[in-house]
Design a protein with these regions (language model features):
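Extended, highly charged segments
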Residues: 1-340
């Protein structure tokens, strides 16, 4: 899915407007890798889901109730101790990372004002939820990462929180059309436009890189060698248009439907698939994420039920066939009973 850093930038803007000043009333952990905050405020969504599930990491408003375990997990109890009654001061995105920081004003054990930060790292299989104190020290994390798991970055109680290691890429917000055109002219000719964009700029997903190539040259797989000068200009222009839209908050989130099943989503309308996918545009990203994963989960549940029913039917069919074969054999043996 396309929960890239640019999508997270739009989500951050949206959550900032909705959550700043909201009070955290309750905290639940319905799943091993999901936290639900009950938040109260003028624009707050009521319940906020923070998921570190590797396949569907996200932060969004939540419709309906989730079934909670009879006994709250230890991490949930820790969050309740530190964050219940706190007010969300600020929602931020460090750099252009797939990370959201929720800065929360709370009262400490002595009744004095303090600051805690709840961090949602939305990075696929590296997704995590981390609680920090006002000195940037990790209080605890949903997934503890020790040196045996990662030599580059550990996430453990008592350690100072560090951002994930930087990639050797450029910020898309620092370069204009002329700069992008000049870099493109000096790029390796045997690379595709998609790969060059992906390797050059930080925070851009493969879907968006292909979209830029398609808008510029009508081909998602076109190589740099095959570009005319005018097409190079268009690649630079389309890249600048998308980067500028993100910087200025010009998001137009949409879901791509394959029939009635959500296939992908983006922060800008996607044109590269033509009429193959149906496009549904949303007003806000939180609703998009909620619908995308709710619909997919429901369809996955239905497919699982269908598979379970088919397995039961096939098992019963095979059992009946075996019984029928035994009865046929008994009948054949019975025909010779007079001779015996």
């Amino acid at each position: 899915m396309s929960l890239d850093a640019m999508f997270v930038a739009g989500l951050k803007d949206e959550l900032s407007r909705a959550l700043e000043g909201a009070r955290i009333d309750k905290i639940h952990q319905p799943e091993r890798d999901e936290i639900v905050l009950a938040v109260r405020g003028a624009k707050a969504p009521g319940r906020l889901l923070i998921s570190a599930n590797p396949g569907k990491a996200r932060v969004c408003g939540l419709d309906g109730m989730r079934e909670n375990p009879p006994n709250a997990p230890m991490f949930c109890m820790l969050l309740r101790k530190h964050l219940t009654g706190g007010r969300i001061r600020r929602v931020s995105q460090p750099g252009l990372e797939r990370i959201l920081d929720f800065e929360i004003d709370v009262m400490d054990e002595l009744g004095l004002p303090a600051k805690k930060t709840l961090t949602a790292e939305l990075m696929g299989r590296h997704s995590n939820i981390i609680l920090r104190d006002g000195k940037n020290m990790i209080i605890d994390a949903l997934k503890r990462i020790d040196i045996a798991m990662s030599e580059k970055r550990q996430v453990l109680p008592g350690l100072i929180y560090d951002l994930p290691p930087k990639q050797n890429k450029l910020s898309p917000f620092d370069y204009k059309r002329a700069d992008i055109f000049e870099m493109l002219c000096g790029a390796k000719k045997d690379e595709s436009v998609e790969k060059w964009l992906l390797d050059t700029f930080f925070g851009v997903s493969p879907l968006i890189c292909r979209e830029i190539a398609y808008r510029a040259a009508g081909d998602t797989t076109i190589g740099i060698r095959g570009l005319s000068d005018s097409e190079r200009e268009r690649v630079a222009a389309e890249a600048e248009n998308i980067f500028t839209a993100v910087k200025s908050g010009g998001f137009k989130p949409c879901i791509l439907y394959d029939g009635d099943k959500p296939a992908d989503f983006s922060f800008v309308p996607i044109t590269q698939y033509g009429g193959l996918y149906r496009l549904k545009v949303y007003e806000d990203m939180s609703c998009l994420l909620r619908d995308f994963y709710d619909i997919r989960d429901e369809k996955d549940r239905l497919q699982k039920k269908a598979r379970d029913v088919m397995k039961t039917v096939n098992t019963a069919y095979e059992r009946a066939n075996r019984k029928l074969e035994l009865q046929r054999q008994e009948l054949a043996d019975a025909r010779n009973r007079e001779e015996i």
